[in-house]
Amino acid sequence: MYPAHLLVLLAVCVSLLGAASIPARPLNLYQFGNMIQCANHGRRPTRHYMDYGCYCGKGGSGTPVDELDRCCQTHDDCYGEAEKLPACNYMMSGPYYNTYSYECNDGELTCKDNNDECKAFICNCDRTAAICFARTPYNDANWNINTKTSC
């Protein structure tokens, strides 16, 4: 092998090792993030909603700290209802992995008619939450709070 080939091979291996350390993000959450950006016209990055209050982000418990946190609690509850649907009750079909069809036109979100029952339900959960986020004030003091003492 030529030295140039070895360098290319080494670069590919290093790239693959780096990519392997990136945690997988469920596709539906990627779509949800895009819906949030559509509804708020890109005014606030999606990551600001990932660790907000008691319910925005992974899990949730206690009393929501404000109206925005209530949007997240409602979204969590909606996903819980989706998981009970027979149509959403097979492998990789639940709310975190099932992708759906929707449109974003100038901040208006529409879940498309070609979604099956499960996809339509999940799309509506995400659409409702994204609209709620867009119309609700964001309080910087409620980002990255200590959920053990505040929730």
UniProtKB/Swiss-Prot annotation:
It comes from the Eukaryota. Residues 1-27 form the signal peptide. InterPro entries: PLipase_A2, PLipase_A2_Asp_AS, PLipase_A2_dom, PLipase_A2_dom_sf, PLipase_A2_His_AS. GO terms for molecular function: calcium ion binding; calcium-dependent phospholipase A2 activity; phospholipid binding; signaling receptor binding; toxin activity. Keywords: Calcium, Disulfide bond, Hydrolase, Lipid degradation, Lipid metabolism, Metal-binding, Secreted, Signal, Toxin. Expressed by the venom gland. It holds the Pfam family Phospholip_A2_1. Binds 1 Ca(2+) ion. Ca(2+) binds at Y55, G57, G59, D76. Disulfide bonds join C38-C104, C54-C151, C56-C72, C71-C132, C78-C125, C88-C118, C111-C123. GO terms for biological process: arachidonate secretion; fatty acid biosynthetic process; lipid catabolic process; phospholipid metabolic process; positive regulation of fibroblast proliferation. The active site is at H75, D126. Its cofactor is Ca(2+). Its main location: secreted. The keyword Iron does not apply. Its EC number is 3.1.1.4. Belongs to the phospholipase A2 family. Group I subfamily. D49 sub-subfamily. This is Acidic phospholipase A2 4.
